[in-house]
Amino acid sequence: MKKLFFFLQFLFHVSLSQEINWSTLYEQENSTSKINFIGTSNSEIFMLSQEGKGLFSSTKKYVLIFDNNTLLFKNKVPIEIENNNQLTYLKCLIINNQLHAFYSKQVQEKSEIYSKILIDQKWGEAKLLCTVPFIESSQINLKYFTTINSLFAFGVRKNELKKINEFCALVLNYNSNSEHIFCAELNSENANLDFTEAQSDTCCNIVLLANYFQKKSFNLNVAIEIPVAIKLTIKNSECKIINLKSLDASNEFSYLINSNQAILLNRENGMPEISFVNFDNDNTSQVLFNSSNSQPTEKEEDYAIEKSSRNTLYEKDFKNLKIKNVFRQKDSSITVVCEQSWKEQICNTLNYRFGGVQCFDYFYSWDVFVFYFSPKGELQNMNRFQKPQVTIDDGGVYNSIVCLQKNNDVLILYNNEPSNLIRKSGKLKTMMYPMSSVLHSIIVNKNGLLNSQRLSNPKEDNAILRPLKTHYINSSEALVLATKNNKFKIGKIKI
């Protein structure tokens, strides 16, 4: 009895220590509102909001500034320069406790990059930072990332002199206003790049992950997709394109751990494979997880068991696996958070006068998998959490998740408990699309579930709020943006 008392006391202490506190900072109902930027400086929180189809198509652009939980400032953002149609939105950054808005203007065959600074809640004059000599700039699809000390702009240009396509990148150091321009030849005149992520180290290396679409010569409508890593070394002015391992010409996810290493999700014969790539060691690849090798292969009739009643995971349980986040722990171990969903048809017997059965095919089974890999790449543990998922009439699916790191644990936020889903005899029933939901959080580590907690009230929200973005304020606080069509809500959570 005494041991039971101490055990319950321990569980109570763990539950309290893992509690998540949510406070709503701001919410707005407008069908065209979007949050483009969230940043923090000291105790102040900066947000850039827009109303309209594009950032420069409407004058209704606002900067919101909070001090802790108090809204200090809301004002329009006058960042237009001459003709709005010539402008491209780059990025907002907080530099030296000031909010900088970067954007570019195309002038003939060049792109001019500007910056406007918010000083004492007033916007200063636009300053021309640099001019990028992109050839035939009208064909360039510029995209932008930020690194530790630099603004990183990149795109594909057509070099008429060499008759080739080139990848080009601009690295602008906004502390010294120095710039570096890199170009590397692409292997095909019809090649294109779909950029996914960029990251830098504290020295002079920048790595960009992209999917390289190379159209086949015999059929220009069919493209081969090749994942590539583009490594820029500022110190030696080098630009190197590295071909990564590609299975079935499909690289569905790439995540940079640092400037030398990445996690990839490929598919082999339709099944997912999670691999680890080292750029500095001859592009070596190490398979971390392969569902066909790690799970028993079962017959179709064996698989058709109600999932909630079985503990064994079969190969089909991983067919639609998608990576949401990757976390590198202090001991160099790796935590990978995935989601898995597939359509199911649920049939209900109706208590109508004429009887009959009605089937709903918009239910999905939605699972969250959390994989834990040792520093050597060995699978240490895997946790699985099941939730219902429903398609809804606003162009998306019901569930959405975002992830944060809490020491060596993972905090997962998602929307849960639709107002008109009823669980009866262990089965889900519904008569219409879900109308509302609550934000929910779980905290997990390699030992399993530590905490499960509701963060909002469906009666107050009266909408399906999907968590979309997160932003760390510090090691113990983060901002969360949740939205559904005509409403967005920004909350601060203590982790």
Question: Model-derived features: where do they sit?
Answer:
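Loop/turn-rich, solvent-exposed surfaces of beta-rich toroidal or solenoidal domains
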Residues: 334-342, 366, 395-450
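Bacterial Sec-dependent N-terminal signal peptides
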Residues: 1-23, 495
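Short, conserved, GDST-rich strand-edge loop motifs in beta-rich repeat architectures
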Residues: 50-57, 156-164, 211-224, 339-362, ...
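Repeated scaffold domains used in trafficking and secretory/extracellular systems
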Residues: 30-37, 84-92, 134-144, 190-198, ...
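Beta-propeller blade signature
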Residues: 61-67, 114-120, 166-176, 222-236, ...
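Conserved blade-ending motifs and adjacent loop-strand segments that build the rim/top face
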Residues: 243-252, 291-305, 383-400, 447-472
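Short beta-strand elements that form the blades of beta-propeller/WD-repeat-like
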Residues: 43-56, 98-105, 149-160, 205-214, ...
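Post-signal peptide N-terminal segment of secreted/secretory-pathway proteins
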Residues: 32, 39-42, 46-145
